[in-house]
């Protein structure tokens, strides 16, 4: 709503389909400034989500071959977005904005795995709350299905795909990292501040503009205002 109010019209949504990803046009599909939402299988491993995102970007490039393409991702979505930049930026993304994303992983993933591996009768505590916020879902069956993405989001250095991603060369585009800032410390109750800061990724050190926002992990209207400001200056 905040993007819409500031002139960024809803261009549509891309959803999984038999053929790959399907674009469902919105009222702003032909507007000069438009945004698109992408529906991804949030419980899937990061590489699988990145595959679907790549298909979505291919669809957008088919419809809009010459327009500037800016990616914005919240939480794990910001990490997924980095995957599609690899290999010489095949979709010609000009800018990446991540919001509260666990670029160096999060200990909450280990807590989620503890819930899965313990096979409890119920899911109290931070493990299930982590899943609700990071990938979505509210019960044990969903948590169990999300084991792959939890392994991917273990703290960097675990030998997982995130560790691999952070060693890959990234294209020379504009990078923004929105880092949550609570009264006690940088970060939030899901992802620590140092993990949200893209400058801590070895191949991106010193190349990222970091913006701090006094907020919890979930998206809020102020994020839309912040995004619109970045987009207007792009």
Regions found by a protein language model. Give the residues of each.
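Helical cap/lid subdomain of alpha/beta-hydrolase-fold lipid enzymes
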Residues: 51-54, 58, 62-63, 85-234
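Alpha-helical structural signal in soluble globular domains
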Residues: 2, 6, 83-88
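Gly/Ala-rich beta-loop-alpha elbow adjacent to hydrolase catalytic centers
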Residues: 72-77, 81
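Residues that line or immediately flank small-molecule/substrate-binding pockets and catalytic motifs
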Residues: 42, 73, 100
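Short, conserved active-site loop motifs that form the nucleotide-linked donor/cofactor pocket
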Residues: 33-35, 69, 175, 207-208
């Amino acid at each position: 709503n905040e993007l819409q109010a500031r002139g960024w019209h809803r261009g549509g949504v891309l959803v999984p389909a038999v053929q790959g990803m399907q674009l469902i046009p919105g009222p702003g599909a032909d507007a000069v400034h438009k945004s698109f939402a992408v529906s991804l299988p949030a419980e899937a491993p990061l590489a699988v989500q990145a595959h679907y995102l790549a298909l979505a970007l291919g669809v957008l490039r088919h419809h809009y071959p010459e327009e500037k393409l800016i990616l914005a991702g919240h939480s794990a979505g910001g990490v997924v977005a980095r995957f599609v930049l690899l290999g010489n930026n095949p979709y010609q993304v000009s800018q990446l904005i991540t919001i509260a994303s666990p670029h160096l992983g999060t200990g909450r993933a280990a807590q989620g795995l503890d819930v899965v591996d313990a096979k409890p009768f119920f899911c109290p505590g931070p493990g299930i709350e982590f899943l609700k916020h990071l990938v979505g879902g509210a019960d044990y069956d969903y948590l169990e299905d999300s084991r792959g993405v939890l392994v991917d989001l273990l703290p960097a250095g675990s030998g997982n795909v995130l560790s691999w991603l952070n060693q890959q060369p990234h294209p020379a585009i504009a990078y923004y990292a929105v880092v949550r800032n609570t009264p006690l410390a940088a970060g939030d109750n899901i992802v620590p501040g140092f993990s949200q800061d893209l400058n801590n990724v070895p191949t991106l050190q010193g190349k990222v503009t970091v913006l701090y926002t006094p907020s919890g992990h979930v998206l809020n209207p102020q994020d839309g205002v912040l995004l619109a400001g970045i987009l207007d200056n792009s």
